[in-house]
Amino acid sequence: TCMAFAFCTAASAQDNFSFWKKDRAYAKNSFSINTGGPSQSVGFQFDHQLSKKTTVSVHYGESVPIDNGVDINGVTYTGTFGDASSWSGVNISYRPIETLQAFRVTAGIGVQSLNGRFDDPDGNSYHWHDGGVFTFTGFGYGLRPVKGVRLGVDIGLIKSGGGVVYTNGLTMDANSRALDFQIANSGGWYPNLQLTAGWGF
């Protein structure tokens, strides 16, 4: 319900403030803040118009650590996901439809360091890490290149090299559980929903 409300709010605002209308001047640049998921995060973004249809965006974000429980093969792990996790990158957005310029398709590349730290019932610790290069593909609505307030929503997929798991446990159980943990979390595919508010200038 919240996502639908945010999407409708962004869509309505952008429809009312189209950049071809006289009350909204064209803007070459903008600065934005955003929040995304599935893991809660906050980020900053600078946009520059290569043309009225094409935008290059430079972004940086950090995950908000959350306490999380994970059950894998009958073993419950407790800990924190998103600890000391951040990413940065560059996206290119293109507006292919002349009469619906709020709609855009986006592709990008960046680097990330994602971390999770968990303990099993026997006291063994596990560190999940997914780092290195990632790519993003998706589509969005809003963030037209206008001066003043800009709103937008984006949906897409992030692809990374996949996570690895390290453990301080020296027993066979700990090593086996680390392998199970890695197999369950090594896909490297992450859905992403992002809400953005910015200022064009």
Language model features by range: what are they?
Residues 26-29, 72-76, 120-125, 175-182:
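Extracytoplasmic loops and strand-loop junctions of Gram-negative outer membrane beta-barrel proteins
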